[in-house]
Amino acid sequence: MQGQTQSISFDGREIRLTTGRFAPQAGGSVLVECGDTAVLVTATRSGGREGIDFLPLICDYEERLYAAGRIPGSYMRRESRPPERATLTARLIDRPMRPLFPSWLRDDLQVVATCLSLDERVPADVLAVTGASIATLLAGIPFNGPMAAVRVGLLGDDFVLNPSYREIERGDLDLVVAGTPDGVVMVEAGANQLPEQDVIEAIDFGYEAICELIKAQEQLLKDLGITQVKPEKPDEDSTVPAYLEKQCSKAISAVLSKFDQSKDERDTALETVKGEVSETIAGLKEDHAVRQALASSPKLLGNSFKALTKKLMRQQILKDGKRVDGRGLDEVRQISAMAGVLPRRVHGSGLFQRGLTQVLSTATLGTPSDAQEMDDLHPNTEKLYLHHYNFPPYSVGETRPMRSPGRREIGHGALAERAILPVLPEKDTFPYVVRVVSEVLSSNGSTSMGSVCGSTLSLMDAGVPLKAPVSGAAMGLIKEGDEVRILTDIQGIEDFLGDMDFKVAGSEKGITALQMDMKITGLSVKTVAEAVNQARPARLHILEKMLEAIDTPRDNLSPHAPRLLSFRIDPELIGTVIGPGGRTIKGITERTNTKIDIEDGGIVTIASHDGAAAEEAQKIIEGLTRKVNEGEVFSGSITRIIPIGAFVEILPGKEGMIHISQLSEARVEKVEDVVKVGDEVTVRVREIDNRGRINLTLRGVPQAGDAADVEPQPTPVAPLS
């Protein structure tokens, strides 16, 4: 198994690329290593499909828990469907790769990245993205690469290239940028309310590093004697496109320039134009060149009509600065926002609408035990904030089977989740687990940013004390040669026919999330910066409209939301609260009808819909963990009697025993002669034995009836801070 390994010195680290050793039947394969992280990436091409008009590309990212020396926790003890973070990494590979394949390619393509070893200092995702480019080049697939990706973090005032998981957690920025020799092709970022300029500088910083990795790939191909296969578009019959341009251009332009019509009216008008030209073609002689071209390629008419519509819409924007709905390039559609649209049994709700895009978001408050446990390679194994995004078929007027969430739904939900995370309250002040669900009720572009806005409305309605409200806007771009137009708040047709989908979310203070996808092979950092800056006034305009619906979080939680009490106990006493086999804590929860969670650090969280019940449970736990000293005096009730003595509950949940010899100064023959179950007595702690058992006495202790002589009962100790 011979192979060739080449090393790249990159930012003070060594990246090792091994080719020719692994997966010999794949079209191309490379093992990318940095530190102890190793990712095997393969690219394979099979024969073309007949009758399709899209690129059948599949990008998969596979995690194996052996990479971290772990055995899966499932019943079968093997990996099953990819976890959410693996799905997001697969999308991270797909998004910069897809626009670099030629639009005419119809071969089945599959890129598979498998994490074989994980070093927590070196996240595997960006290595997988760069490896995907290398494997594709080695496979000889037509590809407008090379392409590479890096991660940029921000620690203090310094940018960090490819930070560790710990540095990402500590920093204010987690940005992944991918690029080609032509420019930036993908950006994905989460930020702690950073100013636009900081994010732009981070993208520029990352692209400079990308250029080094691109040169390294070019050198690798040269050393291996491989010539890159550049896409060469096959000759196409222009008969049908030319005919449509002559017959339909004026009619299509008239539809696109009628700004007072709705989306449905515009779509219907375009279908009418298409139907009329179809009838005209049907009336042509059978030996007409157009009829013959369509006979060999039935989808050519629809594709050519779509291409002509795209061309004319883009010309209208570039030349006239007008969009299909009459808006200017930097104009936002009409905004509507409402909070509390559902009954209060739903803890919080918000309805956000921008143009024809409408999203209903709901917020649910849960207890710490509702946190999501993540069984993947990421060191952070628990999620306290969840955002789920649903996109039903009726939102676009279609019918199809309702299935489990796909990659798109998972990706959009993760973006909206990321946008809100930086403004959530700290766990110490708001210990709830929070789940937001965004239901897309109508879609005409930018539903993910609509979900961000809906999330803010629902969280504020639920009484979550956000550090700042967050809104989002989607930017688009039309580029022909050196001519560039950036569009604010793109709608569906502009997303579909444009060159960029750039989503920016943030507060008044700064950016919290950013995602950019391209349909061209790259964009200059300067143009990216213009889009980032143009998004700010749009975000703030949307935020202003949202704050008209609700400007501060509600003072009170929904009466149907759980009430949480959180306090700290000595971690060494956690076992005392839990009890043998969990009997003690189970008894407390059953007695008080509460839900109790205890963390390893000693933080106790009690959840209940009844505040008094939660306080009762807190008193019991504080009593169990309260240190009792010899000589202290307590008042309590007799809970049970045994032949040699009686037990007294001196603190909630904590008992001590009075031996029969300590019941009276005189000799006692039978315990019941002195006390009975339920009697209130005052006792002194005589001793605490080496097993922690509390021994009590009544001897010499004044009882009720001579209260003036009774020593005061000590005040319970406050929770440990």
From Swiss-Prot:
Cofactor(s) required, per the database record: Mg(2+)
Note the Gene3D superfamilies from the entry.
GHMP Kinase, N-terminal domain, K Homology domain, type 1, Nucleic acid-binding proteins
Q: Does the keyword Metal-binding apply?
A: yes
Q: Name one GO biological process term.
A: mRNA catabolic process
Query: Where is the protein localized?
Result: Cytoplasm
Q: Which domain of life is it from?
A: Bacteria
Q: Does the keyword Nucleotidyltransferase apply?
A: yes
| Residue ranges constituting the S1 motif domain according to the UniProt record | 631-699
Query: Which GO CC annotations does the UniProt entry carry?
Result: cytosol
Q: Matching PROSITE patterns, A to Z?
A: KH_TYPE_1, S1
| Keywords, alphabetical | Cytoplasm, Magnesium, Metal-binding, Nucleotidyltransferase, RNA-binding, Transferase
What parts of the sequence cross the membrane?
A: none
Binding of Mg(2+) occurs at 495, 501
Give every KH domain span: 562-621
Say which enzyme class the record assigns: transferase
Tell me the function of this protein.
Involved in mRNA degradation. Catalyzes the phosphorolysis of single-stranded polyribonucleotides processively in the 3'- to 5'-direction.
What name has this protein been given in UniProt?
Polyribonucleotide nucleotidyltransferase
Gene assigned in the entry:
pnp
